[in-house]
Amino acid sequence: MTIYNHVNFFSKIVNNKIICLDLGDKNIGVAISDQGLKFANPLKVIKRKNFKTTVEKLTSIIELENIGGIVIGWPLNIDGTQGPRCDSTRDFAHAFLRKYKIPICFHDERLSSIAADNLLKETNLKRKQKEKKLDAVAASWILQSLLDVYNNKNLEVLNG
C-alpha cells in the first residue's frame, strides 16, 4: 500500500468505514466514519507508549470496525508550509504501512485542536473529561472536514 491523494484514497474505500488519526506527542486521537462516509464521530484516545503497542491498538480497531482506510491529520504550519511535524507524521505513516497494509491519506489539520476545544467548551463536561476527549474530537473534526469535501464532490480542489 501507499499514501494516496484524496481522490485515489476514496477510490480504494468500498463498503468500509475509515478512521482518522490526530497524532500528538503523547496521544493519538481516533475518530471513525459511518459506513456511508457521511459522518465522523470521536472514537477514542490512544496513549502513545511505543510504536509496537500503538500498531497493536490501531490494528485492533481496524479489524474490529471493518476499516478500509486511514486519514492522518497533516500538521501544516498556519501559513500552509510543511514543518518538522509533517516529517514525523510521514515517518509514522510509512512505518505503519510496513506493519499493516491499508490505504492512507493525509488531510490538513490546521485549527482542528482549536475547533475541538471550542466545541468541548459548549459541553457540561469537567475540565479533565474535556482534556481526555480533546484529541478524539480533533480527529473527528479533521475527518468530518474531509468527508464534507468528499460528499460535495470537491476532492479535485484538495489535490490541486
Describe the role of every protein-language-model region.
Residues 1-19, 26-160:
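Phosphate- and other anionic-substrate recognition elements at nucleic-acid/protein interfaces
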